[in-house]
From Swiss-Prot:
Encoding gene per record: tuf
InterPro entries found in the cross-reference section: EF-Tu_GTP-bd, EF-Tu_GTPase, EFTu-like_2, EFTU_2, G_TR_CS, P-loop_NTPase, Small_GTP-bd, T_Tr_GTP-bd_dom
Organism: Campylobacter concisus (strain 13826)
Family indicated by similarity: Belongs to the TRAFAC class translation factor GTPase superfamily. Classic translation factor GTPase family. EF-Tu/EF-1A subfamily.
SUPFAM superfamilies documented for this protein: EF-Tu/eEF-1alpha/eIF2-gamma C-terminal domain, P-loop containing nucleoside triphosphate hydrolases, Translation proteins
Region (G3): 81-84
Name of the protein in question: Elongation factor Tu
Region described as G2: spans on this chain: 60-64
Length: 399
């Protein structure tokens, strides 16, 4: 009998495994799918299936990522796992796989390692809001005190990066042992630990707010003048809903303007409203065509503001990815492509950093020559003469 399709009537959450190389991220991903598949909540995925991750291109950057899906009693999950450390860095910075929360895998035998720290920092920088911890390889540690010590270290590390370390759920277990149990058709103590982990994920990582329930944000792609009707701006609604009669703001590049929506159209048909994901034309009352341009955004009043200065976490493409062949230095002036337009800006490198090489990821400060609607979490590309040389995310607004 064919396995029935996953039901879509449960809330959907995006998560991923993060942590140091060889601490068991991929084994845990396989174990979750194996244990849940015994309950009819997932399709069994082999370790090798997950580890041989297909390469994807996101904004010209090659990233190897495995996507699996599974369910718990309460939710439907899409889970990302990356084979290499560089893939995580690229994935998190480009937002190729947005995560509503992450499972941090730490080997109980080794404790936190350099990439453990780096992934927690990246999660903080790119806005992964919640972390649940799986202390893996607990079968290799006989000393209960040692387990407690590792748990304390993890909590301190989370606190250091402004995650609530003291309240974070930490479940210890063995992904490999759970995988072996599930494959042997048993529900043993290690499988129970995987279920305990998924219960923690279910309860600790909140269901994300749907895009349609957020404040309106629509990047403007084009502007037309329709005689006798006024100015129409077109674009894809990123979040929220736009309705006829709404008061909205036009933000970015020029001083902020306030106007009223007099019409919404999709595929040349009049609509009462457009919502997140729709490509629409929005008719604006009393707005002149020359006052609006590509790169501005339509938004709910006061929900997003224009800025020229920000801090960002960026990944610089390698030569093989079509990026620069040479490093860049302080005061480098590329274009920053935010949503629909390029704005020139100058880069200030962190103290003690002389230059940035292709393939590096680094925290930079940027000053743009024109204000753009920005908030923490806004993604951008760094371009030079129309080609992408880097990808980034706003981690902090400076002015």
């Amino acid at each position: 009998m064919a396995k029935e399709k996953f039901s879509r009537n449960k809330p959907h959450v995006n998560i991923g495994t993060i942590g140091h190389v060889d601490h068991g991220k991929t084994t845990l991903t396989a174990a979750i799918s194996a244990v849940l598949s015994r309950k009819g909540l997932a399709e069994l995925k082999d370790y090798d299936n997950i580890d041989n991750a297909p390469e994807e291109k996101e904004r010209g950057i090659t990233i190897a990522t495995s996507h699996i899906e599974y369910e718990t009693e309460k939710r439907h999950y899409a889970h990302v796992d990356c084979p290499g450390h560089a893939d995580y860095v690229k994935n998190m910075i480009t937002g190729a796989a947005q995560m509503d929360g992450a499972i941090l895998v730490v080997s109980a035998a080794d404790g936190p390692m350099p990439q453990t720290r780096e992934h927690i920092l990246l999660s903080r920088q790119v806005g992964v809001p919640y972390i649940v911890v799986f202390m893996n390889k607990a079968d290799m540690v006989d000393d209960a005190e040692l387990l407690e010590l590792v748990e304390m270290e993890i909590r301190e590390l989370l606190n250091e990066y402004n995650f609530p370390g003291d309240d974070t759920p930490i479940v210890s277990g063995s992904a490999l042992k759970a995988l072996e149990e599930a494959k042997a058709g048993q529900d043993g103590e290690w499988s129970a630990k995987i279920m305990e982990l998924m219960d923690a994920v279910d309860s600790y990582i909140p269901t994300p707010v749907r895009a349609t329930d957020k404040d309106l944000l629509m990047p403007i792609e084009d502007v037309f003048s329709i005689s006798g009707r006024g100015t129409v701006v077109t674009g894809r609604i990123e979040k929220g809903v736009v309705k006829v009669g709404d008061t909205i703001e036009i933000v970015g590049i020029k001083p902020t303007q306030t106007t009223t929506v007099t019409g919404v159209e999709m595929f040349r048909k009049e609509m009462d409203q457009g919502e997140a994901g729709d490509n629409v034309g929005v008719l604006l009352r009393g707005t002149k065509k020359e006052d609006v341009e590509r790169g501005m955004v339509l938004c709910k009043p006061k929900s997003i503001t224009p800025h020229t200065k920000f801090e960002g976490e960026v990944y610089i493409l390698t030569k093989e990815e079509g990026g620069r062949h040479t490093p860049f230095f302080n005061n480098y002036r590329p274009q920053f492509y935010v949503r629909t337009t390029d704005v020139t800006g100058s880069i200030t490198l962190p103290e003690g950093t002389e230059m940035v090489m292709p393939g590096d990821n680094v925290r930079i400060s940027v000053e743009l020559i024109a204000p753009v609607a920005l908030e923490e979490g806004t993604r951008f590309a760094i371009r030079e003469g129309g080609r992408t040389v880097g990808s980034g995310v706003v981690s902090k607004i400076l002015g």
